[in-house]
Amino acid sequence: MPSHPHLWFPFTSVKDAPDPLKVVSGKGARLTLADGRELIDCISSWWVNLHGHAHLRIVEAIAQQAATLEHVIFAGFSHEPAERLAMELCKILPEKLTRVFFSDNGSTAVEVALKMALQYWHNLDQPRSRILAFDGAYHGDTFGAMSVGERSLFNAPFEKLLFSVEFLPYPETWWGDETVEAKEAAAIAAVEQALAAGDVAAVIIEPLVQGAGGMRMARPQFLQQLAARVQAAGSLLIADEVMTGFGRTGAWFACQRAGIQPDLICLSKGLTGGFLPLSITVATEVIYDTFCSGNPDHTFYHGHSYTANPLGCAAAIASLELLLDSEAIVQGLEDAHLPGLELLAQHPKVTRPRLTGGIAACDLVSDRGGYLDPIGLRVRQAAIARGLLLRPLGNVLYLLPPYCLTPTELQDIYAAIADLLDEI
């Protein structure tokens, strides 16, 4: 049981969990513990850190902004960091995404997108309210986000309170998968059937990679077929890029790598480089225009106390600048992982290896499987003993490190993982 008398930790079994490791500092890809040990942050501290901890350029941007304007209400007021961030983002986003709405985290970015999609149809006086999502999806822990996520132990206590969503098969794939085309065909057939009635408001998907659902990967071809069907049905496509955005898939955004154009996109995690909580939902001008009629009923009545926080915006601007400077590194992420993952894939305890950009994953052979598989905790503990921060999703082992990690360091991590798999 965690020893602190007042803290309550997320996603942690209160009775069974070992004491948390106390971190005193971070620099680059490394974290320093209170006892002096160092860990390589192989998962970007829950997928948020892009450039490494304590990156001076982001530190200075936050400090300068804090000395100028730390926060101001964003209703009826604006400020330069928000305006500049919106302009810079729209230069790199899929071209039709032009209207930026700020909130606080990935869950709220999804909530905003769902509300925008549903109110879009309300504003048009068209009775569309059906939402389609995918098996294995995870979109966050607030009620709307839970509703569009797979029913699981994460949301089981609240299931009766979640709104109705239709879930479609997700054609996950991996290296050597000979059934992927059949799975995609079945998934598209299910999409077509669900869209046939013409009353679907929106379809939401994590493009290319489902994160917390197990780093389940899909091919661009499937996304392209999906987007075409959704567009033909007149429905809206919501891309949840909370995890995949800002280079994680080897492109600025997974939508761009997949060659699709969403109507709404949800961004967070890497938005500020991992320094501060901030999220953004970006909509097309077509959606935005339905909120501009002058009818008070068409106003988007949604906001947060820290909407468009200037410190977060300043951090995000600095992070975008760093991404522009390291674009070649982002484009080379997949090549950097490839040798190590190919070697790891030969291990007898590894199955279903898969790779998209800088997101590498595999399943560990286990009798149980699933999020509560105890093999995950054994891997975590063995990794810490080797100076690595890993947090498997049950029997799903993955790497999602910050971009500052060198290819040599990455190969050393793969070798250490192979070594620990020999022992657990």
Swiss-Prot record:
GO molecular function: adenosylmethionine-8-amino-7-oxononanoate transaminase activity; dethiobiotin synthase activity; pyridoxal phosphate binding
Residues given in the record as substrate binding sites: W46, Y138, K269, G303, R391
GO cellular component, one term: cytoplasm
EC number: 2.6.1.62
Cofactor needs: pyridoxal 5'-phosphate
List of residues binding pyridoxal 5'-phosphate: G106, S107, D240, H304, S305
Positions marked as site (Participates in the substrate recognition with KAPA and in a stacking interaction with the adenine ring of SAM): F11
Catalytic activity: (8S)-8-amino-7-oxononanoate + S-adenosyl-L-methionine = S-adenosyl-4-methylsulfanyl-2-oxobutanoate + (7R,8S)-7,8-diammoniononanoate
In-chain residues carrying the UniProt-annotated modification N6-(pyridoxal phosphate)lysine: K269
Root EC class: transferase
Protein's pathway: Cofactor biosynthesis; biotin biosynthesis; 7,8-diaminononanoate from 8-amino-7-oxononanoate (SAM route): step 1/1
BP-aspect Gene Ontology terms: biotin biosynthetic process
Record localization: Cytoplasm
Pfam families: Aminotran_3
Keyword field: Aminotransferase, Biotin biosynthesis, Cytoplasm, Pyridoxal phosphate, S-adenosyl-L-methionine, Transferase
Subunit structure of this chain's protein: Homodimer.
Function (record text): Catalyzes the transfer of the alpha-amino group from S-adenosyl-L-methionine (SAM) to 7-keto-8-aminopelargonic acid (KAPA) to form 7,8-diaminopelargonic acid (DAPA). It is the only aminotransferase known to utilize SAM as an amino donor. Complements a bioU deletion in Synechocystis PCC 6803.
Family: Belongs to the class-III pyridoxal-phosphate-dependent aminotransferase family. BioA subfamily.
Protein name: Adenosylmethionine-8-amino-7-oxononanoate aminotransferase
Taxonomic source organism: Synechococcus elongatus (strain ATCC 33912 / PCC 7942 / FACHB-805)
Gene from which this protein is expressed: bioA
